[in-house]
């Protein structure tokens, strides 16, 4: 069997890659021509060995040369192994190693081979260092998303249970909190569903991979939708705040329906096409790797657009806020401090931090820049939900006032109930009309008008945000 000229060229290029790996480590080795000759001799010996061997009578995986190593016939439901190919420039380091591959129950070879024992050991040191960094980043974002999930759930309950906090602004906050929670839950669930085969791909590891593949891809789709919804709700926050400060008139309740449609409907417009194209043209593994960058840009482009629009809204809001502070004739130091505080408050709400590394694509991020981009984005994205819940719920003056009022009413109801249980029956008849067990006298000074609602002026809304 002869090798075509095109295949020879491809093989020479791949073998040059092996030489480059060796050159990077500072070792001596053969030229590309010598390495190709060694590979060609290894291939011929493999074919001669397989031709001389007698095929097994029963079901078995066929012996073959997979362009890397020579495989003998293998029994079904077993893990075959072959010695590391001797044409490798670093073969003397890995002579005792093996390449592993699964032979399925149907007599077909599995898709994956494990050649980690045959890799250049000097090259593996850099790989292990990178893997350690990625594992630490995963621990960091797991802690961040878990903390965000817990605080967001509590903030969501507070904004939902206290009726006096119900207004368009807080309805949008509730949906934003929900999108952060869905994003955190989806990412944490995806990590659980993503199989992690060990260095030796045995029967059990491959079976677990095949069983979890469908669930893992489903989790990947849900994750992409939740991430997209999170960005669109950040955009809704920016559009709503900008409309309060710039636009005049209009029904907030009517606009809220459009906000709902934008926040939860827009992500489907780019996630569904991505799923279709990915299934047709890059249906590999768990869809966690993006080898075809054009397909990944179907999702990346709308997200970058939301980041850019929110950044422009952020700049516009800062300009409006600065003009308002100056018209109040505040001292220079006072309005600068107020502007700085408002800026830091708006950054997590609008996701402005995303613009720092937005121009840097995955293709451009290499080496230290790649890890700097990953660390910056992963840290802020995972803890962003926690920051938003703290800034716009837990330390919000309206929320704190309502919690104190609710706690005061709860204690008052409890004390009234205890007093009424101790009084004789005639004491109940002496109570004023309209009072009774479990009822709390209300004060007109605590009317709902004391809290900013949908009809308040834009300046008061800005105060509540900043």
UniProtKB/Swiss-Prot annotation:
User: How is the protein altered post-translationally, as described in the entry?
Assistant: N-glycosylation is required for cell surface expression and lengthens receptor half-life by preventing degradation in the ER.
UniProt keywords (A-Z) are: Cell membrane, Disulfide bond, G-protein coupled receptor, Glycoprotein, Membrane, Receptor, Signal, Transducer, Transmembrane, Transmembrane helix
Protein localization: Cell membrane
Tell me the leader sequence span: 1-21
Q: Does the keyword Signal apply?
A: yes
Note the SS bond partners. 46-70, 61-103, 84-118
In residue numbers, the region (Disordered) covers 427-466
Q: Which family does it belong to?
A: Belongs to the G-protein coupled receptor 2 family.
Show which residues sit on the Extracellular side of the membrane.
22-138, 190-217, 279-293, 363-377
MF GO annotations: G protein-coupled peptide receptor activity; gastric inhibitory peptide receptor activity; glucagon family peptide binding; peptide hormone binding; transmembrane signaling receptor activity
Its GO biological process terms? activation of adenylate cyclase activity; adenylate cyclase-activating G protein-coupled receptor signaling pathway; adenylate cyclase-modulating G protein-coupled receptor signaling pathway; cell surface receptor signaling pathway; desensitization of G protein-coupled receptor signaling pathway; endocrine pancreas development; gastric inhibitory peptide signaling pathway; generation of precursor metabolites and energy
User: What name appears for this protein in its UniProt entry?
Assistant: Gastric inhibitory polypeptide receptor
